[in-house]
Amino acid sequence: MIRWDYPPLRSLADIEAIESIPLEQRITRWDFAQNLLDGCRLQPQRAAIHATHLGDIDGPVQTWTFADLERHAIQIANLLRARGIGADDAVAIIGPTVPAMFALLMGSLLAARPFPINWMLDAPALHDLIVQSGAKAVVALGPTPGFEVWEHVQHAVESLQGRVPVLTVHDPFGPAHPNDLLGAASEHPGDRLMFERPTAQRNSVACYVHSGGTTGHPKIVKILHGGLVFRQWAASLGLAFTPHDVVLSDTPLFHIGGLLVRGLVSTADGHTTIIPSMHGARDKTYIANYWRYVERFGITQISGVPTTLSVLAKNPPTTENIASLRPFFATGSTAMAPSIQDRIEEITGARTLQSYGLTENTSHATLDLRDGEIRPGCSGVRVPYVQVRIVRMSDKGDIERDCAVNEVGMVVLRGPGIAGGYLNDDHNQGVFLPDGSLVTGDLGSLDGDGYIRISGRKKDLIIRGGHNIEPRLIEDALLQCPAVALAAAVGKPDAHAGELPVAYVQLHPGASITEQTLLEFAAAHIPERPAVPKDIVFLDRLPLTAVGKPQKHLLQIDAAERVFRQVLQPLTSAWALKVETSGGGLLLTVSVKGGGPQAHRQVDSLLSAFAVRYKVDVS
């Protein structure tokens, strides 16, 4: 499976040359759990994991060898089976990245179906995902200062009346808790599986991962062994991985990118993984020490979503030796200003390879060519054996035609990374097509050389009087301003145009600029006049998912609240407004005290011109 004499990747011609050999001749076994065991056995005494405490580069380090990791994983697999958890049962995993989580993921892949869940969700959201998945066990971070995971998990499972057992993991630099996972697992053999485990097939479900981080409505995706094995192969090819690599795990394991490229793929390829902090890249101490981590541990590839890289670009290494870094690394998740890419290459010598992917494709479908041209604003070319189409779709969701070169349309993928669909079959309609294609919901275009440019989510289009405005057109322009660190554009409701563009920005620390100056900058850099934002809202911190994507549904709610609080000012009775997203759009609830039918009619007269759903509660 693992090879290190990688061919060059300079153009689509090199991709096509790789495809001259059928994938089935390159990959002959599709059992990803077995690949993990093989990775541990490459160099058993090599360090698999180094963990430090909350970004403290000078503090203690917990180290596991690959032999340690394999032993813990097999013990956990035996523990799960001994407690009646079967191959098709889900194990909900709720907590930040610690060494035990790697063993848990690996062990539950051997015995069951791991389901890493966003540990920052509140109790109702956790409960919903646990119930949806049918999890037969929960493993969560126990009581830990600075984290509310345990409290939320307790509330999430209390209505299950003990039907789902809960085990704990702990801060590796703190005490163990009751029902400690590793303690319970230590009572079981670690040198062999105590149950028969058939070899997983290409279409066998390996694990669950939830999507929906930018919408607030997660869907559970069935990730297949075939998709995981292909992702290992494709990532290793695209980034020329070797067992000598040392990588940082600072992206959450509940995100498909953190789970794979900075998680399980690293283990399967025999990399040493550094866990700098349980808070990951959100830990300011870790980010302040970033270049010291590179020096101390000999990091070979930078890790970082664009938001992290923008901070690192402003804080380059000073005396640190970063010669261990290889000449390229990958990032993704959201648009990044070309100036940040240029600055990172200037201070590190490493090129930033942009990628495009999604959970439903088991991570990336495209990646910049490590030996080829990088085109600003693009996310590389398709990886081998993956088909990327840009199509026009009818209002009914049918594919009408393929788009022309540089024409924007819906991105549709097909290939060995496509997931097995959503756990809830009702969500599959119009997304996972009968021919095996995936309708991504993203808009993009392909140039004549196969480079993809992602414009944004179709649902995020700003529709101004029939004019479709791509948010990225606004965001890319604002990111060219030296004062702007992050930007996100959404539509605000308008009685005449339907929507008008508004931008939310986060400035670099210490930067200053007025709204008027930034509006003028936007007008000068946005080629379409209707796309120039009407307002710019400055935020101390843009709301982001754990991997740096703007949570646009929150910004859409904020923009609507700002509009309708002004629109409803003429109401003569006391009133309150609630705005939420529902059914793919906005839903307003206006609560009025007193006034009877007259108050209801007054609300109708104020809101009827807007293309939003609303309800009126009169008390």
Language model features by range: what are they?
Residues 44-47, 173-176, 186-210, 217, ...:
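Conserved pre-ATP/AMP-binding loop-to-beta segment of ANL
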Residues 121-131, 138-141, 302, 415, ...:
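AMP-binding/adenylate-forming catalytic core of the ANL superfamily
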Residues 28, 45-98, 102, 122-127, ...:
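Conserved AMP-binding/adenylate-forming core of the ANL superfamily
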Residues 229-246, 254-300, 309, 314:
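Conserved AMP-binding/adenylation subdomain of ANL enzymes
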Residues 276, 329-355, 359-452, 458-461, ...:
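Conserved AMP-binding/adenylate-forming
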Residues 63-67, 206-230:
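Conserved AMP-binding A3 loop
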Residues 1-2, 82, 113-183, 613-618:
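Structural core segment of the AMP-binding/adenylate-forming
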Residues 140-152, 276-280, 290, 297-342, ...:
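Adenylate-forming
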